[in-house]
Amino acid sequence: MVVAVGLYTDIGKKTRDLLYKDYNTHQKFCLTTSSPNGVAITAAGTRKNESIFGELHTQIKNKKLTVDVKANSESDLLTTITVDEFGTPGLKSIINLVVPDQRSGKLEFQYLHEYAGVNASVGLNSNPMVNLSGAFGSKALSVGVDVSFDTATSDFTKYNAALSLTSPDLIASLHLNNHGDTLVASYYHLVKNHSGTAVGAELSHSMSRNESTLIFGSQHSLDPHTTIKTRFNNYGMASALVQHEWRPKSFVTISGDVDTKAIEKSTKVGLSLVLKH
């Protein structure tokens, strides 16, 4: 089955990845080892300012069943059980359990069809939060909604809507978020396919504050293993990164942020090292 639409979270994802993915101003190290029998173990550590955060992730795959167990340095334990093709093609079931905060556990279902993608989740507690999102249409045009309902207060805590237009080299999307208060328009343009050269922009406007944020971004592949990205917003914040794949699925990324209005005070540099064996 060919999936043309995807989920609601896929609307505008190309632009978000271009503008935000892999940018960081801290130090991160990640090591993943995997075995032929479907077991993968990932150890990660992140240093931000004077704080250090660690995480250990174990993943076990067996046919249509995937079990993920994550433990971190804050004594949280997250277990996720995913079953693909749950009873019918395109349907996926996901159970999330969190210790010690068991109230944040949830049961989730995802269904992907050629012309629709639906995600539904419900909290595993006495007064659960219920979320329903969906995207409908074709590869060229799709619309989506994202709604959350709090059964404890009988209130809709979230209702968002989105529209996406897609062509072979251009993607444009429009989001209405935060109960209709925030309007986000974005576009992504693939300039040269062979070099991965792309540009994008995102305009976000808050109606209640009457404030707008405009971000421009670009990316270009220097060679098959090295990518550079840049971005700049209307407040004078500039960022850049260089990412090099020095072996299959292993990356080193150096990125930096600077306030062009106060260069001597605001420069921040981040380093990320991801190793997969």
Swiss-Prot record:
Database matches in Gene3D superfamilies: Porin
Q: What biological-process GO terms show up in the record?
A: monoatomic anion transport
Cellular compartments per GO CC: mitochondrial membrane; mitochondrial outer membrane; plastid outer membrane; pore complex
InterPro entries attached to this UniProt entry: Porin_dom_sf, Porin_Euk, Porin_Euk/Tom40
Example GO molecular function term?
A: voltage-gated monoatomic anion channel activity
Which keywords describe this protein according to UniProt?
Ion transport, Membrane, Plastid, Plastid outer membrane, Porin, Transmembrane, Transmembrane beta strand, Transport
Q: Where in the cell is it found?
A: Plastid outer membrane
Major location category of this protein: plastid
Q: What Pfam family does this protein match (any one)?
A: Porin_3
Task: Establish whether keyword Membrane is in the entry.
Answer: yes
Spell out the PROSITE patterns in the cross-references.
EUKARYOTIC_PORIN
What does the record say about domains? Consists mainly of membrane-spanning sided beta-sheets.
Could you say which protein family the record assigns here? Belongs to the eukaryotic mitochondrial porin (TC 1.B.8.1) family.
Q: PANTHER family from the xrefs?
A: MITOCHONDRIAL OUTER MEMBRANE PROTEIN PORIN 3, VOLTAGE-DEPENDENT ANION-SELECTIVE CHANNEL
Q: What does this protein do?
A: Forms a channel through the cell membrane that allows diffusion of small hydrophilic molecules. The channel adopts an open conformation at low or zero membrane potential and a closed conformation at potentials above 30-40 mV. The open state has a weak anion selectivity whereas the closed state is cation-selective.
Q: What is this protein called?
A: Outer plastidial membrane protein porin
The protein's organism comes out as Zea mays (Maize)
